[in-house]
């Protein structure tokens, strides 16, 4: 049972998957936290300004400031407050990528590109519950068709992007 309505929300906080957080619940606005993570990652600095919240992201999409969005592992057209605004923003955005296990979600209606992702039970991983207890999730069945684990989709994209960004 998830108190937040998002089964792995705590895991997202621990890994720094929210726009205002760094891994380990570190605050992106805290200079000491940024320096610690930058040193661990082997980079000089991290941006001082945190990213947009989910609500701010959809506001920026709706007013045309954001021209492309990649949505992974969530269904904001169904789960975020003010669904009318979210759906209007998705309809306005010129390019919407959705990484999702199901093509019938409310958000999928707005996708220009649907990347088939494996669902729970079709991939290995961990889930952190509200008590911060980490559980290993074992793959029970193979993912259908071209569906892959989320990390594999992300790594493949990053490698292709890196190859295109290499100077000639």
PLM regions: where:
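Non-catalytic alpha/beta scaffold blocks inside enzyme catalytic domains
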Residues: 6-168
């Amino acid at each position: 049972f998830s108190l937040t309505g998002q089964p792995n929300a705590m895991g997202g906080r621990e890994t720094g998957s929210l726009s205002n957080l760094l891994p380990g619940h570190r605050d992106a606005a805290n200079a000491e936290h940024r320096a610690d993570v930058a040193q661990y990652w082997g980079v000089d600095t991290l941006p001082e300004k945190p990213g947009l919240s989910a609500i701010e992201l959809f506001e920026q999409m709706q007013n045309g400031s954001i021209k492309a969005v990649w949505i992974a592992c969530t269904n904001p057209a169904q789960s975020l407050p003010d669904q009318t605004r979210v759906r209007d923003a998705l309809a306005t955005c010129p390019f919407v990528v959705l990484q999702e296990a199901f093509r019938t979600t409310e958000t999928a209606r707005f996708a220009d590109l649907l990347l088939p992702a494996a669902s729970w039970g079709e991939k290995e991983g961990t889930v952190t519950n509200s008590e911060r207890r980490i559980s290993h999730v074992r793959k029970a069945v193979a993912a259908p068709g071209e569906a892959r684990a989320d990390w594999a989709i992300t790594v493949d994209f990053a490698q292709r992007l890196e190859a295109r960004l290499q100077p000639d």
